[in-house]
């Protein structure tokens, strides 16, 4: 099973050239990512008892969902020019460092593993203390870029 991400609309490195439909789809996916992050934050605040049980990260499906959506945005930014260089450079290192984990999370959602040991566990992904802040910076940067483009287009439409 494979997934396809249609990122061909933004070819010159800017959301500015994305069609209205493309921007609407990006905003929809951003909303899903934001909702998944909020759900994960609630689950994280409630805590969990970590032990060696592979099911110990059972409540954190929202984390995998959030990461899978960030993965799509990250690949679109790095490989297909979704963000302008000005928007990408501040998060490039965070994005490049996060992408392997994001891809592993996406894979977990689209391919059912043969055993529980084959998937990345939330506790392992967060243990270093850097992963979660890095993901939040990436998340915030994509959200800000999309909001700015959306507002810019709304203002442009009022000027007509």
Regions inferred by a protein language model and the residue ranges of each:
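Amphipathic alpha-helical interface segments
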Residues: 1-101, 116, 121-160
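Long, charged low-complexity segments
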Residues: 103-114
């Amino acid at each position: 099973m494979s997934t396809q991400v249609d990122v061909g609309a933004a070819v010159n490195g800017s959301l500015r050239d994305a069609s209205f439909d493309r921007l609407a789809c990006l905003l929809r996916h951003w909303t899903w990512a934001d909702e998944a992050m909020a759900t994960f934050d609630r689950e994280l605040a409630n805590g969990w008892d970590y032990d060696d049980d592979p099911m110990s990260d059972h409540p954190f499906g929202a984390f995998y969902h959030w990461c899978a959506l960030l993965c799509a945005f990250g690949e679109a930014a790095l490989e297909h020019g979704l963000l302008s260089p000005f928007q990408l450079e501040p998060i490039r290192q965070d994005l490049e460092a996060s992408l392997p984990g994001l891809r592993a999370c996406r894979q977990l959602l689209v391919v059912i593993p043969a055993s529980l040991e084959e998937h990345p566990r939330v506790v392992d992904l967060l243990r270093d203390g850097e992963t979660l802040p890095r993901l939040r910076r990436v998340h915030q940067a994509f959200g800000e870029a999309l909001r700015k483009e959306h507002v810019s287009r709304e203002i442009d439409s009022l000027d007509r």
